[in-house]
Amino acid sequence: MTHDVGERLVASAATLAFPRRSGSEGDRRVIEELSARLEGLGLHVAVEDFSYELAPVERILRWTLLGGAGLVVWAGWLAHSSPIWSGAAIVVLVLCGGILLGWSPWLEGLYRRSGPTRTANVVGKREAAGPGRRLILMAHHDSKSQSLALPARMGATLGALLGVVGVVVGAGVVLAGRGDGLSWMGVTAGVVAGVSMVALAAMSSGNDSPGGVDNAGSLAIVLELAARLRELPPDVELVVLFTGAEEDHMVGAMRWLDLHAEELESVTSDCFNFDGAGSPGRVVLITRYGIGRAFAPDLERMTVTAAREMGTPIRRIVMAPAVGIDAIPFAHRGIECLSFSSGSLGQATYAVHSAGDVAGNLDGDTMARIVDLAEAAVHRWVAGSG
């Protein structure tokens, strides 16, 4: 049974796996296709158009990385001769990085201006009979490719982080009076971090990725869930939200939250998000981000309990720094949003954001397990049990 469901899910995802960067012809095509499928499920469908300009934000991030590269190289150079100044430079670097990497209302303001890129959020809704609760099932519909493959991006990010740590250690060793013979440490670490930051700053995006794992598999999973959840209690409003421009710093999620702010305040809302769901491997729950911040403690508890009862192995992970998912702006508005993903380090994961991210990388059995677990978690949410 699970295998049959999995085959159907992969086939559904395959029809949605084509290059569809925001604003492209593929983007318009997937918006039309998802609208038609939601209508076929008997939902009231709205296509909420919006436009945005990403260039100013990209310039800020690029120049911040380049400035940070220069600063960390300088700090590394000073680590042996002037460790105090080296440490001060690292403090400045960490503060600047923290300001940009930490989500905040002022940062969201950078994304609210209209611009040349036009896309849409696709929303399917089954209204509640009266005031009650709102359940949101969410997945982003856009895809993108990047000039650096995932292993290279991971390597550059790790190189930047470890390089900064290396500069701090080098300066600390000198301050402790044990720097003899280790003058190379700070310089080497600074150069490694600087080169890594320059590589990240030079990275560009394109429209070559079919987005199989990221995120056609998740679209198919949400459509399957919407079909299964036809019989919810009359006081539960079901919202299926396919966001645009997630790959462009979650602009679509922010626009939807802004547009529906008043109604979100009037009714308790919770969200299950699906991103990268369908890659072969264990089911993954993205539960935390930043410094100890939980995305959805109540939804997490319900889902973990359901997984335990079903015997479904899961792995809970923390969202890596500088990585964005639609759950972040939801959490910052006080809306619990638990993200389902899956996978392990392998071909399917390494192909994300490249032309190799095809539907053939999806694993039907994994997708079926995610659907079953999410459905069980929804029923626990409906019953109000942890």
Where are these regions (language model features)?
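N-terminal capping segment at the start of a domain
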Residues: 1-29, 41, 203-207, 276-279, ...
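Second-shell loop/turn segments in exported
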Residues: 1-3, 17-25, 110-111, 151-152, ...
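N-terminal signal-anchor transmembrane helix
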Residues: 1-2, 24-27, 104-134, 207-211, ...
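Alpha-helical metal-binding/catalytic segments enriched in His/Glu/Asp
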Residues: 38, 124, 137-138, 143, ...
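Extracytoplasmic/secreted proteins, especially bacterial periplasmic and envelope-associated proteins
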Residues: 8-11, 29, 33, 224, ...
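A non-catalytic alpha/beta surface segment that caps or lines the substrate-entry region
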Residues: 12, 18-127, 148-187
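His/Asp/Glu-rich mid-to-C-terminal helical/loop segments that flank catalytic regions of hydrolases
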Residues: 345-386
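Metal-dependent peptidase/peptidase-like ectodomains
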Residues: 152-154, 233, 245-345, 349
